[in-house]
């Protein structure tokens, strides 16, 4: 079984492909939310915990923010550094496991006006919520998937005689509730907003086969048989150009709190 770092390294190229598509409506709405609620101002100091390839780092740097990026994946950080190169505003990128940090390291000493963690497991309990909050003199923001529907994936698994299963190990609603409870237990007042986020991934038959193998078949003793079976079925499910539209319909929980407002 892959380590946490190996798991994120294995999907770094996928994240980079999404980054190259540019900002989408969901990203824009999130940036507007931060700005309209006074969380984000031009030139403020922001840390992105579990930054991936630095997608939000580039958006924030374009606003003149001083950006610090952290991620457990060395490949993600390598790509993040490449993506941040065009920006002349201050930025730092660090490969680390947030669990191993104290939050008092020199690079965090000045503190941050906004701390974010979007779709990352880095913030997951009272301890990590407190650590994130202690390094922030303003707002903390965590985004987590609350619901995930993927009709084509389910159709393929039904066709293969398999019971559809989620890509996530934990129940998404339970995970979001745990974060909200952790914020409250840490002494802060959690707020939550739930937003729709839908997209479609266009994949070739081979790319969809690899996606299914990586996310659903890899731990099975019959994984190679499942790979061949999926490939055979997908050849009959693609369009005339050999492509597949894999639609994903989700709801995201935006969980946020002000570190200067304690219970």
Where are these regions (language model features)?
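Conserved class I S-adenosyl-L-methionine
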Residues: 1-40, 43-52, 141-163
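Class I SAM-dependent methyltransferase SAM/SAH-binding core
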Residues: 53-100
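A short SAM/SAH-binding and catalytic strip from SAM-dependent methyltransferases
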Residues: 112-127, 146
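A short glycine-rich, Lys/Arg-flanked "PGG" loop and its adjoining helix->strand segment in the class I
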Residues: 126-141
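Short alpha-helix
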Residues: 171-187, 192
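Conserved Class I S-adenosyl-L-methionine
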Residues: 191-263
């Amino acid at each position: 079984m892959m380590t946490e770092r190996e798991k994120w390294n294995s999907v770094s190229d996928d994240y980079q492909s999404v980054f190259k598509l540019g900002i989408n409506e969901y990203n824009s709405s999130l940036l507007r939310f931060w700005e309209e609620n006074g969380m984000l101002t031009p030139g403020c100091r922001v840390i992105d915990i579990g930054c991936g390839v630095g997608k939000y780092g580039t958006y924030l740097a374009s606003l003149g923010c001083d950006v610090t990026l952290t991620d457990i994946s060395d490949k993600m950080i390598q790509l993040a550094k490449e993506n941040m190169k065009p920006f002349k505003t201050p930025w730092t990128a660090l490969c680390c496991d947030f669990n191993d940090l104290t939050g008092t390291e020199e690079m965090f000493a000045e503190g941050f006006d906004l701390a974010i963690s979007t779709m990352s497991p880095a913030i997951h309990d009272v301890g990590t919520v407190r650590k994130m909050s202690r390094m922030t003199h303003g707002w903390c923001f965590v985004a987590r998937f609350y619901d995930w529907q993927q009709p084509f994936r389910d159709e393929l698994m039904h066709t293969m005689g398999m019971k559809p299963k989620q890509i996530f190990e934990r129940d998404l609603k339970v995970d979001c509730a745990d974060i909200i409870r952790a914020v409250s237990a840490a002494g802060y007042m959690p707020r939550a907003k739930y937003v729709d986020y839908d997209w479609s991934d266009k994949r070739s038959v081979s790319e969809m086969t690899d996606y299914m193998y990586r996310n659903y078949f890899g731990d099975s003793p019959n994984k190679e048989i499942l790979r061949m079976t999926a490939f055979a079925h997908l050849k009959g499910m693609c369009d005339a150009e050999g492509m597949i539209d894999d639609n994903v319909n989700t709801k995201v929980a935006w969980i946020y709190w002000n570190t200067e407002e304690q219970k």
